[in-house]
């Protein structure tokens, strides 16, 4: 029976049958990360485990497929493919001889079931690419080494030792399918299942290939050149058609999805296409104004600080942010001003600041009434006693 060949999809993902979509997605991500072939290079079974997890997720993440699976189990794969109710589309029984004809049509034979030995598309792969902020902002070209499953060169995908051939499966007679008969109130119900001996292949390998150990497929590393466009950010996905795992039995290869992860930068904070950086100036520079050099992604640049600049003020440098992923041009760089107050002052610096405070009529620590009067007297003397 098929139950021996295929595990329950809920069991594979480790979730209850009433699991929510979010719980199913979370379980899939955790298991996919754990059993990804890239992270299990020394485990030859990781690729099959990863494929099993992906197959379970493809069904349970789709509401229609999940509903059919909950009702029919793995037999849902044989009942109308991507369709729903196998009786859907028939308005009545006038064109048929009776109930026996109808049941024979739907349940009576394997001729109308899909061929389990047909071409199978290769699995999609996902690769996380780490980038610096500058690489993400301007774009770059990266050469990746991506593990993927391909046909074995020794046996050319047959799984059999060179000089031998797979033999016809004795259980299904080479059809790849077996019939399971059930008796219901309507009569006999014949369900066509995938053969658990050959797993739908129709043939079995008696003398396995020493290279792939009878699997017909091996894991290799392919070199892939990726052109990363400017403006990508963490989570951006690039699709490379045909760079996934090789298909089975002449099926097309899957796709490779490159997922970007941009490393944090100690100088810049990113918000969309704009960048933010903080630069420090003295309180005297803030009061009187100055010109300072700041870092940008393009290199150092001189900016003007206007007099009277306050802490937290921002100076915008247009076109100095990241490239826009969609559209042309670049974002802006926002320079946030931080004003530093000196921790220690020389005696002369202190005197000068006290004089400034007196001129502005501000009372500060260290200013005595006598000092304040003495300073005012000096000012009057300087102005001719007026």
UniProtKB/Swiss-Prot annotation:
<comment type="subunit">
    <text>Homodimer.</text>
</comment>
<feature type="binding site">
    <location>
        <position position="169"/>
    </location>
    <ligand>
        <name>Zn(2+) 2</name>
    </ligand>
</feature>
<feature type="binding site">
    <location>
        <position position="212"/>
    </location>
    <ligand>
        <name>Zn(2+) 1</name>
    </ligand>
</feature>
<comment type="similarity">
    <text>Belongs to the DnaJ family.</text>
</comment>
<keyword id="KW-0346">Stress response</keyword>
<feature type="binding site">
    <location>
        <position position="172"/>
    </location>
    <ligand>
        <name>Zn(2+) 2</name>
    </ligand>
</feature>
<comment type="function">
    <text>Participates actively in the response to hyperosmotic and heat shock by preventing the aggregation of stress-denatured proteins and by disaggregating proteins, also in an autonomous, DnaK-independent fashion. Unfolded proteins bind initially to DnaJ; upon interaction with the DnaJ-bound protein, DnaK hydrolyzes its bound ATP, resulting in the formation of a stable complex. GrpE releases ADP from DnaK; ATP binding to DnaK triggers the release of the substrate protein, thus completing the reaction cycle.</text>
</comment>
<protein>
    <recommendedName>
        <fullName>Chaperone protein DnaJ</fullName>
    </recommendedName>
</protein>
<dbReference type="GO" id="GO:0006260">
    <property type="term" value="P:DNA replication"/>
</dbReference>
<dbReference type="InterPro" id="IPR036410">
    <property type="entry name" value="HSP_DnaJ_Cys-rich_dom_sf"/>
</dbReference>
<dbReference type="InterPro" id="IPR036869">
    <property type="entry name" value="J_dom_sf"/>
</dbReference>
<dbReference type="GO" id="GO:0005737">
    <property type="term" value="C:cytoplasm"/>
</dbReference>
<dbReference type="InterPro" id="IPR008971">
    <property type="entry name" value="HSP40/DnaJ_pept-bd"/>
</dbReference>
<feature type="binding site">
    <location>
        <position position="155"/>
    </location>
    <ligand>
        <name>Zn(2+) 1</name>
    </ligand>
</feature>
<dbReference type="GO" id="GO:0009408">
    <property type="term" value="P:response to heat"/>
</dbReference>
<feature type="zinc finger region" description="CR-type">
    <location>
        <begin position="139"/>
        <end position="221"/>
    </location>
</feature>
<keyword id="KW-0479">Metal-binding</keyword>
<dbReference type="GO" id="GO:0005524">
    <property type="term" value="F:ATP binding"/>
</dbReference>
<feature type="binding site">
    <location>
        <position position="195"/>
    </location>
    <ligand>
        <name>Zn(2+) 2</name>
    </ligand>
</feature>
<feature type="repeat" description="CXXCXGXG motif">
    <location>
        <begin position="209"/>
        <end position="216"/>
    </location>
</feature>
<dbReference type="GO" id="GO:0042026">
    <property type="term" value="P:protein refolding"/>
</dbReference>
<keyword id="KW-0863">Zinc-finger</keyword>
<dbReference type="GO" id="GO:0051085">
    <property type="term" value="P:chaperone cofactor-dependent protein refolding"/>
</dbReference>
<feature type="repeat" description="CXXCXGXG motif">
    <location>
        <begin position="152"/>
        <end position="159"/>
    </location>
</feature>
<keyword id="KW-0235">DNA replication</keyword>
<feature type="binding site">
    <location>
        <position position="209"/>
    </location>
    <ligand>
        <name>Zn(2+) 1</name>
    </ligand>
</feature>
<dbReference type="InterPro" id="IPR001305">
    <property type="entry name" value="HSP_DnaJ_Cys-rich_dom"/>
</dbReference>
<dbReference type="InterPro" id="IPR018253">
    <property type="entry name" value="DnaJ_domain_CS"/>
</dbReference>
<dbReference type="Pfam" id="PF01556">
    <property type="entry name" value="DnaJ_C"/>
</dbReference>
<feature type="binding site">
    <location>
        <position position="198"/>
    </location>
    <ligand>
        <name>Zn(2+) 2</name>
    </ligand>
</feature>
<dbReference type="GO" id="GO:0031072">
    <property type="term" value="F:heat shock protein binding"/>
</dbReference>
<keyword id="KW-0862">Zinc</keyword>
<keyword id="KW-0677">Repeat</keyword>
<dbReference type="Pfam" id="PF00684">
    <property type="entry name" value="DnaJ_CXXCXGXG"/>
</dbReference>
<dbReference type="Pfam" id="PF00226">
    <property type="entry name" value="DnaJ"/>
</dbReference>
<dbReference type="GO" id="GO:0051082">
    <property type="term" value="F:unfolded protein binding"/>
</dbReference>
<keyword id="KW-0963">Cytoplasm</keyword>
<feature type="repeat" description="CXXCXGXG motif">
    <location>
        <begin position="195"/>
        <end position="202"/>
    </location>
</feature>
<dbReference type="InterPro" id="IPR002939">
    <property type="entry name" value="DnaJ_C"/>
</dbReference>
<dbReference type="GO" id="GO:0008270">
    <property type="term" value="F:zinc ion binding"/>
</dbReference>
<feature type="repeat" description="CXXCXGXG motif">
    <location>
        <begin position="169"/>
        <end position="176"/>
    </location>
</feature>
<keyword id="KW-0143">Chaperone</keyword>
